[in-house]
Curated annotation (Swiss-Prot):
Organismal lineage: Bacteria, Pseudomonadati, Pseudomonadota, Gammaproteobacteria, Pseudomonadales
Signal peptide as annotated in the record: 1-24
Region named 3 X 2 AA tandem repeats of X-P: 190-195
PANTHER family: LIPOPROTEIN YIAD-RELATED, STATOR ELEMENT OF FLAGELLAR MOTOR COMPLEX
InterPro entries referenced in this protein's UniProt entry, alphabetically: Bact_OuterMem_StrucFunc, OMP/PagP_b-brl, OMP_bac, OmpA-like, OMPA-like_CS, OmpA-like_sf, OprF_membrane_N, TSP_type-3_rpt
Organism of provenance: Pseudomonas aeruginosa (strain ATCC 15692 / DSM 22644 / CIP 104116 / JCM 14847 / LMG 12228 / 1C / PRS 101 / PAO1)
Main location: membrane
Protein's recorded name: Outer membrane porin F
Gene: oprF
Gene3D superfamilies for this protein: 2.40.160.20, OmpA-like domain
Coiled-coil residues: none
Length: 350
């Protein structure tokens, strides 16, 4: 009956622990365990090896040090006498200090323990009478494995040494056991404090601290670089140079890719605009070449606007005739270079 009551208390405690919200390990936590052990008696005692079932409750003084009180009852214990076997009753109460290795949390935590125990045995004599009590020193070691922050399984090995000398000397016994349990109620580790941003002086309010500001008097609303100086915008540009056959204003197929590149750039920088400039070589009259250069400029503009979707208001077309050569018109090679349309677009990179 005592064993049933003990196990009932332990099981009830485990259920209650599982319903709690404030589960934690470490300092101030409580640990409750149910165990079963195989008890190996000293050879000088008139008792056979037996089983010990019970439970324990422990309190963590620190993250690693636990003080645990346990109670167990011997099960199926028999004495050996000349008159035959006698069923023996008994219990064992222990108080142990336990030191855990490792860090609280999920995983394996080895431990060592030491403490005192009180053993109470009845029906010890061959006439089914008598009581034997003994105070014993405990020493042990084992492993706990935490499946979660709170639930664990344990394997243990404990030795006991009788402090009171009997007729047959001091008695030494040992136990090997398994257990399961919960721990709860500890205080969670305090979260690390939020880093405090360094406070610096910024006299010109440009966002750069005075101790690294190389331009400490920057006017308000001026964009600055990492040194606190007015940012210099990076200028990016695209140039276009489309060549034409003699006396022609039709854009050749091999020039479309270059025109598309210019159109893509203008779409990337929608505030830009451009002037498409048409040119000719020196063959023909000035008036004819002027008209030809304008047709060439308008042909390229049409491709930009109609083929590649650049807004018409952003593209201007102008012809310069033969007035702006870039090569010698006295040679065929030079005249081929001069039959051209040019355009350029600049933008400030953000």
């Amino acid at each position: 009956m005592k064993l049933k009551n003990t196990l009932g208390v332990v099981i009830g405690s485990l259920v209650a622990a599982s319903a709690m919200n404030a589960f934690a390990q470490g300092q101030n936590s409580v640990e409750i365990e149910a165990f079963g052990k195989r008890y190996f008696t000293d050879s000088v005692r008139n008792m056979k090896n037996a089983d010990l079932y019970g439970g324990s409750i422990g309190y963590f003084l620190t993250d690693d040090v636990e003080l645990a009180l346990s109670y167990g009852e011997y099960h199926d214990v028999r004495g050996t006498y000349e008159t035959g076997n006698k069923k023996v009753h008994g219990n064992l109460t222990s108080l142990d200090a336990i030191y855990h290795f490792g860090t609280p949390g999920v995983g394996l935590r080895p431990y060592v323990s030491a403490g005192l125990a009180h053993q109470n045995i009845t029906n010890i004599n061959s006439d089914s009478q008598g009581r034997q009590q003994m105070t014993m020193a405990n020493i042990g070691a084992g492993l706990k494995y935490y499946f979660t922050e709170n639930f664990f399984a344990k394997a243990s090995l404990d030795g006991q040494y009788g402090l009171e000398k009997r007729d047959n000397g001091h008695q030494g016994e040992w136990m090997a056991g398994l257990g399961v349990g919960f721990n709860f109620g500890g205080s969670k580790a305090a979260p690390a404090p939020e880093p405090v941003a360094d406070v610096c002086s910024d006299s010109d309010n440009d966002g750069v601290c005075d101790n690294v500001d190389k331009c400490p008097d920057t006017p308000a609303n001026v964009t600055v670089d990492a040194n606190g100086c007015p940012a210099v915008a990076e200028v990016v540009r695209v140039q276009l140079d489309v060549k034409f056959d003699f006396d022609k204003s039709k854009v050749k197929e091999n020039s479309y890719a270059d025109i598309k590149n210019l159109a893509d750039f203008m779409k990337q920088y929608p505030s830009t605009s451009t002037t498409v400039e048409g040119h000719t070589d020196s063959v023909g009259t000035d008036a004819y070449n002027q008209k030809l250069s304008e047709r060439r400029a308008n042909a390229v503009r049409d491709v930009l606007v109609n083929e590649y979707g650049v807004e018409g208001g952003r593209v201007n077309a102008v012809g310069y005739g033969e007035s702006r050569p870039v090569a010698d018109n006295a040679t065929a090679e030079g005249r081929a270079i001069n039959r051209r349309v040019e355009a350029e677009v600049e933008a400030e990179a953000k």
